[in-house]
Regions:
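NAD(P)+-binding Rossmann beta1-loop-alpha1 motif at the extreme N-terminus of oxidoreductases
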Residues: 1-51, 59
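Residues at the starts of beta-strands that form the adenosine-phosphate
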Residues: 2, 25, 111, 138, ...
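Internal alpha-helical scaffold of NAD(P)-dependent oxidoreductase catalytic cores
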Residues: 131-214
Length: 279
């Protein structure tokens, strides 16, 4: 299988390294010439992707910000062979899916599937890419135009790269869930670390501090775009969180032992219930 990747940062670079290691042939490109050179040195790509060799691809993946999807994919579409699959790896889906729908009308011989590998690091760039980033990760698929045979083939391809499970959903549900499981976590971590006490934490912190602050480090350009793209769902989650925090604050300020105990027990019980369901 021949794979094309546009955008060779942390995600695109890691995916390329994983695919090359698994024995697939990877064609890749990046707007940054230095990144492309590093990708070749790190064995994230076998060949540089261009319109001359795009016809060899079985799968073409965009691993750039959602706002750039249309402009980076469009030049290659007319050169792809019949039955090729076009995917994206962006962190929000509604906007990209609408673009895919338009492209699918213009290119009826191609298949289009939105994708989101649920893996990442607090760092960015090809330098931080690894061939193990996706081990046991979940892969989310948002089919736009793909029959069951194509979807099964793509699922098996991702499983062969080390992904542990495949989730098929809609763009709307993807964005609703990601607002909670990913974007809200980054906002909370980023806001938490702004406490003046953070600069004095050395010697006073352990696992809980490290867990909560890991994703405070982020690519601010990318995350700004993702959060604003998903602003409706993220705003709802933030409002819920602020209301919940307000209850804790009130109980603590009022030294209301019973209320605080109830709040803490509620959170503990919800966590235990969720963990049991996961098993």
């Amino acid at each position: 299988m021949n794979i094309g990747i546009i955008g060779l940062g942390l995600i695109g670079g890691s995916f390329g390294r994983t695919a090359v290691k698994a024995g697939y042939t990877v064609y890749g490109t990046d707007i940054n010439a230095e990144t492309l050179e590093k990708a070749q040195l790190l064995k994230a790509v076998d060949y540089v992707l261009d319109t001359d060799n795009a016809g060899k691809l079985d799968v073409l993946i965009s691993a750039v910000n959602p706002s750039d999807f249309s402009s980076v994919i469009m030049p290659y579409l007319q050169f792809l062979k019949k039955g090729a699959v076009v995917m994206d790896f962006s962190g929000t889906k509604r906007g990209v899916v609408e673009v895919m729908k338009r492209f699918s009308e213009s290119y009826p011989d191609l298949f289009f599937i939105g994708g989101h590998p649920m893996a990442g690091r607090e760092f960015s760039g090809i330098d931080k890419s690894t061939a193990t980033l996706f081990n046991k990760a979940s892969m989310i698929f948002v089919p736009v135009k793909a029959d069951i045979f194509v979807l099964d083939k793509i699922k098996l391809f991702f499983i062969s790269l080390g992904f542990s499970e495949a989730v098929i959903t809609t763009a709307e549900n993807h964005d609703r869930m990601i607002a909670f499981t990913s974007q809200l976590c980054h906002v909370v971590s980023n806001a938490f670390i702004k406490s003046k006490t953070a600069r004095e934490h050395f010697g006073y912190s352990a696992g809980s501090y490290n867990d909560l602050t890991r994703v405070a480090r982020m690519n601010s350009d990318m995350w700004t775009e993702l959060m604003l793209e998903n602003g409706d769902f993220l705003s709802e989650e933030l409002e819920t969180l602020l209301n919940n925090l307000g209850e804790y604050l009130e109980a603590i300020r009022n030294r209301d032992r019973q209320k605080l105990k109830e709040l803490l027990k509620e959170g503990n019980d919800v966590k235990e219930l969720i963990d049991q369901r996961r098993k």
